[in-house]
Amino acid sequence: MKFFIDTASLDEIKAANELGVLDGVTTNPSLIAKIVKDPANFTYADFKAHIKKICDIVDGPVSAEVTTLKAEEMIAQGEELAAIHENVVIKCPLTVEGLKAIKHFSSNGIKTNATLVFSPTQALLAAKAGADFVSPFVGRLDDISTNGMELVKQIVTIYDNYGYLTEVIVASVRNPLHVVESAMVGADIATIPYSVIKQLANHPLTDKGLEKFMEDAGVMKP
């Protein structure tokens, strides 16, 4: 299973990369907005420069999302983003217009990530249009009392049934259990906030054991 980090923070990306477990990065407009210190003067050129910095840190796919709703505009914007670095993946919303853009990109060798996926039919359409990745949002489904992980299971089954090569990125991950369940149902990737990545390494019994080991190590003579 691959681990992506879901953030636009360069510091978080660097920290996660140092752990040796990072395979890629996903960003979106909301995550970009969190790291902008001067929104009034933040330009599209600044956005592209930031994506380039991320690509310089991580040797893996970096998803950058289009910020328009019409297919023609998504295509123009996506082609501009794809030119930043060979690892850039264009995130398109799973809408009718988004599908048109995904088909265009897949036909022209530009990698895509179908995002904001909340149903198996959306995921099926994404695969048929040639998306390289599909991102079901489990946490947001859980928020409305729907089983988000059940959707992931359905998508994995459908893709396996028909041999689709689209990789499933479990998104909107809220806790370590989401990661465990993603691995158990066979998802290809989980894209995880840095706070949750750190939680994956923690266990109270590990802390307790270390405390005892350090205490016992103190009796050793130099």
Curated annotation (Swiss-Prot):
Catalytic residues in the record: 91 (schiff-base intermediate with substrate)
Pathway: Carbohydrate degradation; pentose phosphate pathway; D-glyceraldehyde 3-phosphate and beta-D-fructose 6-phosphate from D-ribose 5-phosphate and D-xylulose 5-phosphate (non-oxidative stage): step 2/3
GO BP annotation list: carbohydrate metabolic process; pentose-phosphate shunt
Keyword annotations: Cytoplasm, Pentose shunt, Schiff base, Transferase
Compartmental location: Cytoplasm
The EC number(s) this enzyme carries: 2.2.1.2
EC primary class: transferase
Pfam families listed in its UniProt record: TAL_FSA
Known catalytic reactions: D-sedoheptulose 7-phosphate + D-glyceraldehyde 3-phosphate = D-erythrose 4-phosphate + beta-D-fructose 6-phosphate
A GO CC term attached to the entry: cytoplasm
InterPro entries: Aldolase_TIM (IPR013785), TAL/FSA (IPR001585), Transaldolase_3B (IPR022999), Transaldolase_3B/F6P_aldolase (IPR004731), Transaldolase_AS (IPR018225), TSA/FSA_arc/bac (IPR033919)
Top-rank taxon: Bacteria
A single GO molecular function term of this UniProt record: aldehyde-lyase activity
Function: Transaldolase is important for the balance of metabolites in the pentose-phosphate pathway.
Annotated PANTHER family: FRUCTOSE-6-PHOSPHATE ALDOLASE 1-RELATED, TRANSALDOLASE
HAMAP family: Transaldolase_3b
Family classification: Belongs to the transaldolase family. Type 3B subfamily.
Protein name, UniProt field: Probable transaldolase
Protein's organism: Chlorobaculum parvum (strain DSM 263 / NCIMB 8327) (Chlorobium vibrioforme subsp. thiosulfatophilum)
Gene behind the chain: tal
